[in-house]
């Protein structure tokens, strides 16, 4: 949670909100931030945290107040950062029986079910001091923000395991998701293509890398030299675009350097980005400067598949399969010492897409 991080001067157009996964999720936020978020000017009922559109939240806290109405309960929930009112609708009564039981056995069964339901209601009754989890949409009623629950339940947490887990989870989610401004990669890419001259050098390199990837995939290129990419007209035209060089914090200079050395350098950096993602790789430590496209190297696919297939027959791998690091170690021994984790991950994903292997659990794979 960062001070002022919920403020965003410019709203993302509502048509692009669906590109942000936070919009469709139940956002796990501190209650303080739920109370401080500003409502969208475009769509009432949607709130913004650091540019992220939020309409549903997930809170966990202690009940500090209970009010009962005919149709709902109103719980005051405190998570130690703030207190918010949660409207939790009562469950419909489905106990009524339309016709009298025709036998004593049916009467006995009905009585037992009624007693069971009463026991469940008693055990799950929420009182002051209980821990409650609420998931629902944010509403404003009489200028007070509240949550209208779609799901709520009492949390049985005598040794605070669940609450401690939430306390450890939230800072990580904030750091990795909520405190990162919402950016639409599709929109940024479209803007970059329409005006590539407005990019700085790292952004232009990243865009060139993406366009090179598309070229390699569309043409099913198996291997290439850097010089061959430099001869592709569309890629060369993009690399020739002027870039922005920031001379100081308040001064921006436009500079165009189209020397062959500069062109060679930007292509080299673009290919390096592809290598870091495991999309291309080199054999024999790159002595021949030849790059291989991971997706098209069927021989590498077969060898990795064979390693998994053979090792999964061994007793210690039959149940869970082979771990990623085990496959990597075997591949480096039998295929190539310099095989990177990124390349192996790409191969495993391709094999899994083709149903040659399956992931039994996180980082474990097996073959049939």
Curated annotation (Swiss-Prot):
Spans annotated as Interaction with CTC1: 1-185
Main location: nucleus
Compartments where found: Nucleus; Chromosome, Telomere
GO cellular component: chromosome, telomeric region; CST complex; fibrillar center; intermediate filament cytoskeleton; intracellular membrane-bounded organelle; nucleoplasm; nucleus
Known DNA-binding region: 57-155
SUPFAM superfamilies linked to this entry: Nucleic acid-binding proteins, Winged helix' DNA-binding domain
Related illness: Cerebroretinal microangiopathy with calcifications and cysts 2: An autosomal recessive, multisystemic disorder characterized by intrauterine growth retardation and, later in life, premature aging symptoms, including poor growth, graying hair, liver fibrosis, portal hypertension, esophageal varices, osteopenia, pancytopenia, hypocellular bone marrow, and vascular telangiectasia resulting in gastrointestinal bleeding. Brain calcifications and white matter changes are responsible for signs including spasticity, ataxia, or dystonia observed in some patients.
Protein name as it appears in the record: CST complex subunit STN1
UniProt source species: Homo sapiens (Human)
Gene: STN1
């Amino acid at each position: 949670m960062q001070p002022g991080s919920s403020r965003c001067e410019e709203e993302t157009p509502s048509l692009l909100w669906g590109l942000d996964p936070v919009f469709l999720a139940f956002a796990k936020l501190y209650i303080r931030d739920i109370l401080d978020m500003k409502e969208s000017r475009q769509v009432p009922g949607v709130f913004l945290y650091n540019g992220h559109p939020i309409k549903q939240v997930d809170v966990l806290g202690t009940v500090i107040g209970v009010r009962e109405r005919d149709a709902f309960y109103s719980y005051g929930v405190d998570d130690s950062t703030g207190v918010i009112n949660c409207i939790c609708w009562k469950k419909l009564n489905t106990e009524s029986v339309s016709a009298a039981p025709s036998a004593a056995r049916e009467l006995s069964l009905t009585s037992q079910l009624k007693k069971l339901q009463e026991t469940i209601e008693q055990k799950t009754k929420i009182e002051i001091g209980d821990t409650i989890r609420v998931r629902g949409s944010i509403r404003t009623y009489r200028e007070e923000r509240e949550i209208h629950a779609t799901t709520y339940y009492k949390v049985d947490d005598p040794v605070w395991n669940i609450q401690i887990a939430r306390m450890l989870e939230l800072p990580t989610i904030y750091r990795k998701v909520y405190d990162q401004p919402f950016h639409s990669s599709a929109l940024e890419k479209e803007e970059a293509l329409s005006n590539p001259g407005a990019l700085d050098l790292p952004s232009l390199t990243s865009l060139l890398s993406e366009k090179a990837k598309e070229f390699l995939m569309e043409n099913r290129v198996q291997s290439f030299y850097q010089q061959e990419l430099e001869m592709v007209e569309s890629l060369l035209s993009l690399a020739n675009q002027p870039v922005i060089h920031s001379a100081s914090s308040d001064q921006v200079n436009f500079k165009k350097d189209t020397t062959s050395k500069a062109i060679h350098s930007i292509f080299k950096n673009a290919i390096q980005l592809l290598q870091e993602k495991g999309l291309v790789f080199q054999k024999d430590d790159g002595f021949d400067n030849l790059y291989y496209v991971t997706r098209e190297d069927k021989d590498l696919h077969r060898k990795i598949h064979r390693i998994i297939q053979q090792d999964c027959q061994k007793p210690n791998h039959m149940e869970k399969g082979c771990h990623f690091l085990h496959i990597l170690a075997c591949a480096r021994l039998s295929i190539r010492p310099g095989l990177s984790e990124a390349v192996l991950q790409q191969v495993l994903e391709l094999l899994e897409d083709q149903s040659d292997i399956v992931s039994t659990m996180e980082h474990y794979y097996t073959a049939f």
